[in-house]
């Protein structure tokens, strides 16, 4: 049997009117952001496990488990909102992948960070996603 699947909170699709970060600002926010993301990844795993347990239970035996699941989903949603309030965008709740909106050669890009990385080391074009990650050594923040 495969491991727990992830739960995708409804608000992971960001609006593009978020705060813009310089690379330095994004890195400065990481101590706080990483704590949020660590909790988010953990609660996401918990939700996946809870969902699997509920699927295996019959009718009335599901009651308390479903209540626990609702509480966990509410906690996850509040963590997503907390992350969003900072200006970071959740991309993958399983790996803790997030983006900050930054600038490169006069246009918006995503400064890309994943839980466990010491600093923001990559960026990518808005539509290319993580597959298009490039080292920040090539980032030109001037307009």
Locations of regions flagged by a protein language model:
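Long, hydrophobic N-terminal alpha-helical segment
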Residues: 1-57
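Long, non-globular targeting/processing and low-complexity regions
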Residues: 2-11, 81, 115-116, 120, ...
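A structural signal for alpha-helical segments
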Residues: 21, 28, 64-67, 71
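Short acidic/polar alpha-helix capping motifs at helix-coil junctions
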Residues: 43-46, 60-63, 72-75
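Charged/polar positions within long, soluble alpha-helices
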Residues: 45, 52, 81-88, 116
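Heptad-repeat coiled-coil alpha-helices
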Residues: 49, 53-56, 60-63, 85, ...
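Short amphipathic alpha-helical coiled-coil/interface segments
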Residues: 68-83
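Glycine-rich, aromatic-bearing surface loops/beta-hairpins
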Residues: 85, 89-143
């Amino acid at each position: 049997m495969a491991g727990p699947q992830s739960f995708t909170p409804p608000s992971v699709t960001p609006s593009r009117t978020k705060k813009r970060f310089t690379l330095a600002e994004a890195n400065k926010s990481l101590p706080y952001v990483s704590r949020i993301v660590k909790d988010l990844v953990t609660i996401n795993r918990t939700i996946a496990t809870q969902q699997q347990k509920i699927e295996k239970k019959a009718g009335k035996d599901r009651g308390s488990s479903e209540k626990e699941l609702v509480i966990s989903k509410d906690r996850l949603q509040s963590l997503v909102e907390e992350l969003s309030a900072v200006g970071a965008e959740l991309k993958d709740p399983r790996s803790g992948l997030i983006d900050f909106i930054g600038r490169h050669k006069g246009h918006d890009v995503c400064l890309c960070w994943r839980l466990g990385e010491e600093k923001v080391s990559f960026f990518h074009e808005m539509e290319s996603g993580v597959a298009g990650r490039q080292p920040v050594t090539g980032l030109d923040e001037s307009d």
